[in-house]
Amino acid sequence: MLEKRNFYINGSWVAPKKPSDIEVINPASEKACAVISLGSKDDVNDAVLSAKEAFKTWGYSTREDRIALLETFYTLYKKRWNDITDAIIQEMGAPKDFASKLQTGTGASHTKSFITVSYTHLTLPTKA
């Protein structure tokens, strides 16, 4: 069974401050397929503070940097297509074709759309 008990906060995987686990149930089989940790108020606060700090520089990143990041993400997403599909099958009980073509496909399609729009319509703020 898959166990994911840490959170990705401020560029690192960190243990929850107040561990509290829950099973993820596959609705098709009604069996547990994973164990995850629930975030506490302190975990959420840490994540929000980290995001606020990151936005200080991300908010002024260049169009080229953002597009490069999205393109890298898109490439990695396609490489992990089967892993993403398998996770959707387990966590949502979705049939394989539906999970792959529609659910996994939607994430790829949205990312590709963000890239396309970024080339032509992205306006970024400048530092004052």
Question: Where do the PLM segments sit?
Answer:
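N-terminal Rossmann-like NAD(P)+-binding subdomain of aldehyde/semialdehyde dehydrogenases
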Residues: 1-122
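A short, hydrophobic C-terminal helix/tail in secreted or cell-surface proteins
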Residues: 123-128
